[in-house]
Curated annotation (Swiss-Prot):
<keyword id="KW-0472">Membrane</keyword>
<feature type="transmembrane region" description="Helical">
    <location>
        <begin position="33"/>
        <end position="59"/>
    </location>
</feature>
<dbReference type="GO" id="GO:0006123">
    <property type="term" value="P:mitochondrial electron transport, cytochrome c to oxygen"/>
</dbReference>
<keyword id="KW-1133">Transmembrane helix</keyword>
<dbReference type="GO" id="GO:0004129">
    <property type="term" value="F:cytochrome-c oxidase activity"/>
</dbReference>
<dbReference type="GO" id="GO:0045277">
    <property type="term" value="C:respiratory chain complex IV"/>
</dbReference>
<dbReference type="GO" id="GO:0007417">
    <property type="term" value="P:central nervous system development"/>
</dbReference>
<feature type="topological domain" description="Mitochondrial matrix">
    <location>
        <begin position="25"/>
        <end position="32"/>
    </location>
</feature>
<keyword id="KW-0809">Transit peptide</keyword>
<dbReference type="InterPro" id="IPR008433">
    <property type="entry name" value="Cyt_c_oxidase_suVIIB"/>
</dbReference>
<comment type="function">
    <text>Component of the cytochrome c oxidase, the last enzyme in the mitochondrial electron transport chain which drives oxidative phosphorylation. The respiratory chain contains 3 multisubunit complexes succinate dehydrogenase (complex II, CII), ubiquinol-cytochrome c oxidoreductase (cytochrome b-c1 complex, complex III, CIII) and cytochrome c oxidase (complex IV, CIV), that cooperate to transfer electrons derived from NADH and succinate to molecular oxygen, creating an electrochemical gradient over the inner membrane that drives transmembrane transport and the ATP synthase.</text>
</comment>
<dbReference type="GO" id="GO:0005739">
    <property type="term" value="C:mitochondrion"/>
</dbReference>
<protein>
    <recommendedName>
        <fullName>Cytochrome c oxidase subunit 7B, mitochondrial</fullName>
    </recommendedName>
</protein>
<feature type="transit peptide" description="Mitochondrion">
    <location>
        <begin position="1"/>
        <end position="24"/>
    </location>
</feature>
<feature type="topological domain" description="Mitochondrial intermembrane">
    <location>
        <begin position="60"/>
        <end position="80"/>
    </location>
</feature>
<dbReference type="GO" id="GO:0005743">
    <property type="term" value="C:mitochondrial inner membrane"/>
</dbReference>
<keyword id="KW-0999">Mitochondrion inner membrane</keyword>
Length: 80
């Protein structure tokens, strides 16, 4: 009995999903803000971040201290 009920429910769910998709595909919806401007907002935000970090990394004068090799000399060890 269980497989029969399960298959009936699956068919019912598939049909309802198919009907919903068919209903949605026939509707004409107007584009919202994200449809109109989403890609432009994303591209301008990415450009702003890249330009800002490029300026900070190259022009502000931050000492980044990437590697101490060749700049750090060990102090002489003193016996006490």
């Amino acid at each position: 009995m269980f497989p029969l009920v399960k298959s009936a429910l699956n068919r019912l769910q598939v049909r309802s999903i198919q009907q919903t998709m068919a209903r949605q595909s026939h509707q004409k919806r107007t584009p919202d803000f994200h449809d109109k401007y989403g890609n432009a907002v994303l591209a301008s935000g990415a450009t702003f971040c890249i330009v800002t970090w490029t300026y900070v990394a190259t022009q502000v004068g931050i000492e980044w201290n990437l590697s101490p090799v060749g700049r750090v000399t060990p102090k002489e060890w003193r016996n006490q």
